[in-house]
């Protein structure tokens, strides 16, 4: 079972495609800098840690003005 759950993650970011993009971008940043903001991450992989950051509301997404205007 996925921890955090997809349902709790989709309450933070409304689109699963945006969720994947944000988590992947943050995971790449973590691979380069090796910095996780969550104190005791459950996952040992960067993507899992990024999802935990989103679930803890440490990492969020603000849509760009171009996407809002459409």
UniProtKB/Swiss-Prot annotation:
Organism: Bacillus cereus (strain G9842)
The protein's name in its UniProt record: DNA-directed RNA polymerase subunit omega
GO molecular function, one term: DNA binding
Homology family: Belongs to the RNA polymerase subunit omega family.
Pfam hit, one: RNA_pol_Rpb6
Quaternary organization: The RNAP catalytic core consists of 2 alpha, 1 beta, 1 beta' and 1 omega subunit. When a sigma factor is associated with the core the holoenzyme is formed, which can initiate transcription.
Catalytic function, reaction form: RNA(n) + a ribonucleoside 5'-triphosphate = RNA(n+1) + diphosphate
UniProt keyword annotations, A-Z: DNA-directed RNA polymerase, Nucleotidyltransferase, Transcription, Transferase
Physiological role: Promotes RNA polymerase assembly. Latches the N- and C-terminal regions of the beta' subunit thereby facilitating its interaction with the beta and alpha subunits.
SUPFAM superfamilies per record: RPB6/omega subunit-like
Enzyme Commission designation: 2.7.7.6
GO CC annotations on file: DNA-directed RNA polymerase complex
One of the GO biological process terms: DNA-templated transcription
Domain of life: Bacteria
